[in-house]
């Protein structure tokens, strides 16, 4: 948030836009390559176990495993905390989607185009997955424990990148900030500022921000990744994003966070869980002393 405010005070609006390069193309034989990477490290992630152990394919798997071993030796995955305690940022040391590109997977059903996302959702306790230029943000269930989830995520990431498979099967630029023919000057400036100043800063915290619309001076944005359920997301929007947009674009009056059906359901469940905790605490608290005499207690 402080970075956004300092940017607003020091920087001028750039007129150049980040180009979106194709991320990858369709890949074949996903599981064979993944099994080979698993064989290289002598452990098998869930989808690779059955495949790699088939006798007919053993020779092919072991042949490719040498390449997987070489790739894995050079991979060192780091983790970084995010403002959201339920989300953790994983830095594999290699490009995930490439600079400026992001992809949000709020649930396993949205991971149809990404072999890596599918594998990560198979880790018990993983609630959501988010890909950035050079990082992966994992959001866990409230009941999940990072001590159990992190080793599994490490194994999946190592296996996957050693296999050489594409992260997603289709290129996907940031369509929300693509300049359209019917965009007026204000909308164009908002999209430009989001892409060049705001989005990179939010991505540093393992999340992303998506432009949803502009009407009557109100900019509508959707938070993704670690920012989607972060307790400080409203503060970030109001004190960081809104201040910067208003600094450069006087037409902007306010910023509103947009929630989809999945977000609303998650927030409702969280409120219900929080309410049940408060009720349990009130039941467990000892009763206050009763003043039988009616006078002022000592």
UniProtKB/Swiss-Prot annotation:
<dbReference type="GO" id="GO:0005739">
    <property type="term" value="C:mitochondrion"/>
</dbReference>
<dbReference type="Pfam" id="PF08712">
    <property type="entry name" value="Nfu_N"/>
</dbReference>
<dbReference type="Pfam" id="PF01106">
    <property type="entry name" value="NifU"/>
</dbReference>
<dbReference type="InterPro" id="IPR036498">
    <property type="entry name" value="Nfu/NifU_N_sf"/>
</dbReference>
<keyword id="KW-0809">Transit peptide</keyword>
<keyword id="KW-0496">Mitochondrion</keyword>
<keyword id="KW-0408">Iron</keyword>
<feature type="region of interest" description="NifU">
    <location>
        <begin position="190"/>
        <end position="258"/>
    </location>
</feature>
<dbReference type="InterPro" id="IPR034904">
    <property type="entry name" value="FSCA_dom_sf"/>
</dbReference>
<dbReference type="GO" id="GO:0005506">
    <property type="term" value="F:iron ion binding"/>
</dbReference>
<dbReference type="InterPro" id="IPR014824">
    <property type="entry name" value="Nfu/NifU_N"/>
</dbReference>
<dbReference type="InterPro" id="IPR001075">
    <property type="entry name" value="NIF_FeS_clus_asmbl_NifU_C"/>
</dbReference>
<protein>
    <recommendedName>
        <fullName>NFU1 iron-sulfur cluster scaffold homolog, mitochondrial</fullName>
    </recommendedName>
</protein>
<feature type="compositionally biased region" description="Polar residues">
    <location>
        <begin position="279"/>
        <end position="288"/>
    </location>
</feature>
<dbReference type="GO" id="GO:0051536">
    <property type="term" value="F:iron-sulfur cluster binding"/>
</dbReference>
<dbReference type="GO" id="GO:0016226">
    <property type="term" value="P:iron-sulfur cluster assembly"/>
</dbReference>
<comment type="function">
    <text>Molecular scaffold for [Fe-S] cluster assembly of mitochondrial iron-sulfur proteins.</text>
</comment>
<keyword id="KW-0411">Iron-sulfur</keyword>
<comment type="similarity">
    <text>Belongs to the NifU family.</text>
</comment>
<keyword id="KW-0479">Metal-binding</keyword>
<feature type="binding site">
    <location>
        <position position="227"/>
    </location>
    <ligand>
        <name>[4Fe-4S] cluster</name>
    </ligand>
</feature>
<feature type="region of interest" description="Disordered">
    <location>
        <begin position="279"/>
        <end position="298"/>
    </location>
</feature>
<feature type="binding site">
    <location>
        <position position="230"/>
    </location>
    <ligand>
        <name>[4Fe-4S] cluster</name>
    </ligand>
</feature>
